[in-house]
């Protein structure tokens, strides 16, 4: 969901309701934008254009996102938060940590972060601790690796995009996906 409006009739649907062809299992919130469009929320400015102060932006204040996610979490929905930038990933992990602190069996909850693109090493540690499943847009590496490295975020951050090898080494479950037709 972008914003906090609840779609008409959505409150009548329960998690896992449906049939063999269509079942409702989750709700997705959009915490930031795209790295290629320089709208993903970063802690440090983008590298391009040179000298920029652009850091992208969060779509929600942290408390607003928490208050939007909590009712769905409490009803048992699988929650996914779109977070490309490290600032948005921080926000998603902070909210997930707060939500999981209030439940008896946190390991039974299915929480995802979609994209998990520009990362910091400590985010991988917290992701594992919380049991969050990152979903990587693996096309970023093939189609955008060079622009990330040379222009968008620079070498150091580009070397940490979509860190599936690090996640595998640490025993963290993760998924791959595509944003087709937006990108392959």
Regions flagged by a language model, labelled:
Residues 2-6, 27-30, 82-86, 116-118, ...:
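Active-site beta-loop-alpha junctions enriched in small/polar residues
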Residues 1-28, 108-121, 147-175:
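Phosphate/diphosphate-binding loops
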Residues 1-78, 124:
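Active-site-adjacent helix-turn-beta-strand microarchitecture at beta-sheet edges
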Residues 35, 77-87, 136-138, 167-184:
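Short acidic/histidine-rich active-site segments
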Residues 89-97, 144-150, 180-184:
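Histidine/acidic-residue-rich catalytic or RNA/ligand-binding cores of hydrolases
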């Amino acid at each position: 969901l972008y914003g906090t409006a609840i779609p008409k009739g959505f409150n009548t649907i329960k998690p896992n309701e449906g049939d063999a062809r269509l079942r409702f299992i989750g709700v997705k919130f959009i915490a930031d934008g795209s790295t290629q469009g320089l709208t993903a929320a970063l802690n440090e400015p983008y590298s391009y254009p040179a000298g920029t102060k652009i850091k992208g932006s969060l779509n929600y204040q942290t408390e607003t996102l928490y208050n939007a996610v909590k009712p769905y979490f409490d009803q048992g929905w699988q929650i996914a938060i779109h977070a490309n930038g490290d600032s948005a990933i921080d926000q998603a992990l902070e909210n997930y940590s707060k939500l999981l602190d209030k439940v008896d069996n946190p390991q039974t909850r299915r929480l995802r972060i979609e994209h998990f693109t520009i990362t910091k090493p400590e985010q991988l540690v917290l992701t594992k601790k919380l049991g969050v499943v990152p979903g990587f847009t693996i096309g970023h590496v093939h189609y955008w690796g060079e622009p990330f490295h040379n222009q968008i975020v620079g070498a150091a951050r580009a070397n940490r995009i979509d860190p599936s090898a690090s996640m595998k080494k640490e025993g963290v479950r993760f998924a791959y996906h595509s944003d087709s037709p937006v990108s392959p």
